Amino acid sequence: MTEQLKEEEVQIIIHHWIRTLNIKLGWIKDFDNIVVNYVSTAFMLDSFCSSSKLISTFTGHTNIVWSIDRSIFDDSQLICSGSGDSTVRVWDIDTNKQIQLFDEHSASVYCVKFSPYHYYNYHQYVICSSSNDETIRFWDIKDNKQLQIFNDHTLGVCGIEFSPFNGGRYLCSGSDDNTICLWDVETSKSLHVFNGHGDTVFCVDISPLQNNNNYNDNKMNNIGVIGGNGYTICSGSRDETIRIWDIETTKQLNVFNGHKECINSVKYGSNELLNAILSGSDDESIRLWDIRSGEQIQVFNGHSGSVMRVEYSPFVIKNSIGNSNVICSGSFDKTIRFWDIRSNKRELHVMKLDERVTCLKFMKLKKKVNNNEKKSNSDSCVNLCYCSAEELIYSISSNAYYKLKIVKLFMMSK
């Protein structure tokens, strides 16, 4: 590997994880833009695709795996998963072994998330799961017990998402009862129910950054949310619409029409894509929307089956007008596809698989080292983890590993 390629790989990893910190931890709004001025984001998607390989397969579920999430607690690297077998499972990435199983749901588990609220406030390792049994449950990994249960929905609960503000204290959920519910994790109370969809709400997301200039994080709105002013929720439904909801006023702000079938996945953008939403649908398309105008910006066609999950990748590509972000989609057509977000031409790369893809997630993982190698917390790599309709979880990694020098990272902002 050339020195230039190594440098490009380090640069894009730095850029991607600074962007993640900006979203998750609320770093100053212009920090990412400052760093971009000093870091060239020229890491080619081809570098990942040409050197990627299957590194792990997690087996144990006995039905379709609907959801995965990743978290690094202390020195442990963990994945959690939710399945049609009604279980939530926890896996150790370093050993590829299942370390915990929660089986108190009585129906399919549709979504799982590690709880930032419990970790940052109580240093508890907790998973939140939503199920077709009409409940949302919280599980303590270390003590192997259920901590909380939310049961205000009247039908199955589909997508869930923690708030990026106030330490993840709030959770939103979409349901077969056609509603979105906003919960206070601290009190276990439902704060508000958003009505407007005409069918099942399969997916939800909360905007990563405030859309106005109100930085009073301690202000409480009229439904009891602290720090949520300026944030919005987006929801995708079987009614073929995407809707935007204002957390402060609880009003519906916009409706996006364009998909011809059920919407399975919605994702807010960040930074330069702050005013964009990405969506995937049973109509086999991926669409990009402008939040401000309510207009469709791009439509990406190429899949021959339902698009189950869309994600913003950590990669960028060079094109005729400069650098462009790369988005990723997983489908029932047994492919994962990469797209130039600025172009609706053919996909950049297609990963052909043996199973239908139900979900996917990019993960920063620590490099596995041999016993005779010196272990360093700064050795890390980017992995693509995906779930299949055939009960398995796979992890794909590039052969290239990236050693991030934290001192240099912070010096770039000066």
Q: Model features per residue range: what roles?
A:
Residues I68, V88-D92, V112, I136-D140, ...:
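WD40-repeat beta-propellers
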Residues M1-D69, F73, Q77-C80, D205-G224, ...:
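Intrinsically disordered, low-complexity acidic/Ser/Thr/Pro-rich linker and tail segments
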Residues F58-V65, F102-V109, P116, F150-V157, ...:
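WD40/WD-repeat beta-propeller blade N-cap
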Residues K53-S56, S76, K97-Q100, K145-Q148, ...:
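A structural motif specific to WD40 beta-propellers
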Residues S81-D85, S129-D133, S173-D177, G196, ...:
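Conserved strand-to-loop turn within each blade of WD40 beta-propeller repeats
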Residues D69-S76, T95, K113-Q124, D143, ...:
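Loop/turn segments within WD40 beta-propeller blades
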Residues T62, T87, Q98, S106-S108, ...:
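A conserved positional marker within WD40/Gbeta-like beta-propeller blades
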Residues F300-R309, S343-N372:
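Conserved blade-ending motifs and adjacent loop-strand segments that build the rim/top face
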